[in-house]
């Protein structure tokens, strides 16, 4: 079997790890642990992404060097990963000599192949700081909807995207100075010549989720690829480009090369040959990333690797975003939970198991429903899995397991055979299928214990041998289940290894029963989740003023009103009404025919055949789903709509369109721009608007 080199996207060294990040790192860790259990050679690598303007500015503000800032953040990141049992074979930094050397090697290859060009780029310049401003360091008034205090790349209110130079009354977020428009020479990499190759490579069988491959084909590879801007002028924290003094590689150039640098450092430490991992057909390279960085990893990155004659990724596994209780993570609601905050209140095993139960090979978003987290862990892990050991191990603590495996009606053999399918699910990144199968095995094992009643046998001395046999079967079924869960719950596997006095680190162990061995005194393997602990975690995540405010619902409504109505006095000038006068009067009977409902957007995607439309899937509560085509493509990104509550006309007659059936209408306001209408906090999908 080929060697496996596995990577996760590199966390940026300007912020702490939160529960959204942990979706990906948990997904990667489970994959690595499964393959290690099968005996396959696997290295899992990561590093901190350390370059860019944000790091430089933070260091200035804190009066420290960039090196100190990134060193502290690296230590914090690695501490959080270790606490969540996420194991990397090596954890590096993009600000390393190994990364610089590899950047220079790949850059030389790009130069040699004539892929590097120059272009005059116009940007905003802060005269006080003496530096060009990245989009997120410029604020001003949105040129589309006139919303104040918006960033230089997109508007939080109307969702429009634009160039920073289009902002009305722009100002530097660093100094408040009015920026100047200046030009600078930027270095570009032309990847258009690689478009035929990329069109074929992205469609490779198993290369990436099919929906991602189709998205790339329809949105990027169907027309000429733009040159990629890979440089930034000084001042900038990063690697200076050797043949372009005063210019630095942009963070998205050197960040993916960080995968290779981490590999090089690991190889040097372990005495391995770097080319065996990055220039060998005997190595499979798998990247695990979020859907927001697909472009870099599936177009620009493979083109770079090909230019320098390195191996290309065998697979790019893409996951969706995380919502909490159906909504975007929110600091004001306490659902923007840092890893360190979570650890104060809950066991990391809970989150690892919950994420595993939701992750599949598809690019679906994951909702962390906190009530479901409590119920799932308590019902499945504690009541079904761990309870197997607590119900049986104490009866054989003195005698140990039977010397010969007893007759069990085929339960052990069936579970051993099921291990092949569970392993295949892990290998396909379909952890949800794997955990469903494991819970089904736990159900069968508990049915056996319920039927055999070891607690009743323990009261009959003459049935001591039968009691030992029953507990031997129960504990062997339990051991199989925990072996299958070991990639998800490594600490539980370690604890069970101590309880049963046996190794729990090889997948094949589930094929052979454990007999004639002692059993240690039972100790609690996992505690139930207390809802109060979840509530305390959320309370800690809220800003102090939010947590202390009386009348939580009123406070939330006031916040929502302020966000929606900022600058209202300046906009209530009657212009909108004059432009689109009121419609003719209708009766209450006419109006009552229109059924307006609250709905939640659960999926959103581009419609390749339509310039203005997004395809939305909305939930009206429960299993009720509608497909709606909405003309909002110019104003909203699909990924920003997931989880949002909107108002829909639910009884509008379906309309057949060439790209599908539209089963309703989403309500929005506006003339030249579009603003989706959302209900106040407290509204739930399915509620009627009266």
Swiss-Prot record:
A motif ('HIGH' region) lies at residues 11-21. It is an enzyme of class 6 (ligase). InterPro entries: aa-tRNA-synth_I_CS (IPR001412), Anticodon_Met (IPR041872), Met-tRNA-synth_bsu_C (IPR004495), Met-tRNA_ligase_1 (IPR023458), Met-tRNA_synth (IPR014758), Methionyl/Leucyl_tRNA_Synth (IPR015413), MetRS_core (IPR033911), MetRS_Zn (IPR029038). Binds 1 zinc ion per subunit. Is required not only for elongation of protein synthesis but also for the initiation of all mRNA translation through initiator tRNA(fMet) aminoacylation. PANTHER family: METHIONINE--TRNA LIGASE, METHIONINE--TRNA LIGASE, CYTOPLASMIC. This is Methionine--tRNA ligase 1. It comes from Sorangium cellulosum (strain So ce56) (Polyangium cellulosum (strain So ce56)). The lineage of its organism: Bacteria, Pseudomonadati, Myxococcota, Polyangia, Polyangiales.
